[in-house]
Amino acid sequence: MIPGEIDALPGDIDINAGLPTVTVEVTNTGDRPVQVGSHYHFFETNPALSFTRAQTRGFRLNIAAGTAVRFEPGQTRTVELVALGGERKVYGFRGDVMGDL
């Protein structure tokens, strides 16, 4: 093996298979772009993003790790979210939860 080489199995990788998901329509009501990373607790995103927040508690974007979704001012887009795993505790972000989900 060469340093840095990736030896992956053939075929597609199905990320987050079998985990609960929710689809949400999101509108950026602000005057600046908002970018949300793959592992950010969607419930706690920028208040300029308008959507039904209650249904997103405990969810993050269902996209590959290290990537993000950008919402331009005035833009509406539909995103799929996936349930957070692990102990289902959330700390930090905007400080809206700070504990068990």
UniProtKB/Swiss-Prot annotation:
Assembly and oligomerization: Heterotrimer of UreA (gamma), UreB (beta) and UreC (alpha) subunits. Three heterotrimers associate to form the active enzyme.
Entry keywords, A to Z: Cytoplasm, Hydrolase
Family: Belongs to the urease beta subunit family.
GO CC terms in record: urease complex
Domain of life: Bacteria
Annotated pathway: Nitrogen metabolism; urea degradation; CO(2) and NH(3) from urea (urease route): step 1/1
Subcellular location: Cytoplasm
Enzymatic reactions: urea + 2 H2O + H(+) = hydrogencarbonate + 2 NH4(+)
Entry's Gene Ontology BP terms: urea catabolic process
Upper lineage: Bacteria, Pseudomonadati, Pseudomonadota, Gammaproteobacteria, Oceanospirillales
Keyword Nucleotide-binding attached: no
The protein's enzyme class: hydrolase
GO MF terms, alphabetically ordered: urease activity
Annotated organism of origin: Hahella chejuensis (strain KCTC 2396)
Keyword Cytoplasm carried by entry: yes
Name of this protein: Urease subunit beta
Major place of residence: cytoplasm
Record EC number: 3.5.1.5
